[in-house]
Swiss-Prot record:
Biological role: Catalyzes the NADPH-dependent reduction of 7-cyano-7-deazaguanine (preQ0) to 7-aminomethyl-7-deazaguanine (preQ1).
Listed SUPFAM superfamilies: Tetrahydrobiopterin biosynthesis enzymes-like
Compartments, record wording: Cytoplasm
GO annotations of cellular component type: cytoplasm
Biological processes, Gene Ontology terms: queuosine biosynthetic process; tRNA modification
NADP among keywords: yes
Name of protein: NADPH-dependent 7-cyano-7-deazaguanine reductase
Record keywords, A-Z: Cytoplasm, NADP, Oxidoreductase, Queuosine biosynthesis
Pathway assigned in UniProt: tRNA modification; tRNA-queuosine biosynthesis
Annotated EC: 1.7.1.13
GO MF term set: preQ1 synthase activity
Length: 158
């Protein structure tokens, strides 16, 4: 049984359930939001992107990261297909690790206006040095449990 995609005031044209082209750069990517049916309840939502890629802005070589995005929703939830497309748009985007991580966190916060958001960018080593980048919007609401992001410190092959 096929359903017609629902449209909402939040995202009148959701990408979910539609054939869409992959955005070629982050600025062209659309992040969709949907109403939060539990907006009066504090809870944590987590997205994990273990195979995030972007390009070094100097060498053009690929960089790889494990991203963990935690947020306490306000009136909106982040729609996961649009997040996948947004993150994939960085594949041919040249930026330093810090810029990619913080820009992603800020863009999501702007779009969905969460009560709290944190992003951890765990970048795989280039030149022998892993870079971990963390950004958050402010104080976590007191009644929310936030588990550890679960990414072990890089230990090499040994």
């Amino acid at each position: 049984m096929s359903k017609t995609p629902r449209k909402s005031a939040a995202s009148p044209s959701l990408q979910l359930g539609q054939a869409v082209e992959w955005p070629d750069r982050p600025e062209a990517a659309k992040l969709d939001r949907v109403p939060n049916p539990q907006k009066d309840t504090h809870f944590l939502a987590r997205f994990t992107a273990p195979e995030f890629t972007s390009l070094c802005p100097v060498t053009g070589q690929p960089d790889f990261a494990h991203l963990v995005i935690d947020y306490v929703p306000g009136p909106w939830l982040l729609e996961s297909k649009s997040l996948k497309l947004y993150l994939a748009s960085f594949r041919n985007h040249g930026a330093f690790h810090e810029d990619c991580t913080v820009a992603i966190g800020k863009r999501i916060a702007t779009e969905i206006k969460p009560k709290w958001l944190r992003i951890g960018g765990y970048w795989y080593p280039r030149g022998g040095i892993p870079i971990d980048v963390f950004w958050q919007t402010g104080k976590l609401p007191k009644d929310v449990w936030v588990p550890d992001q679960g990414v072990q410190p890089y230990r090499g092959r040994g």
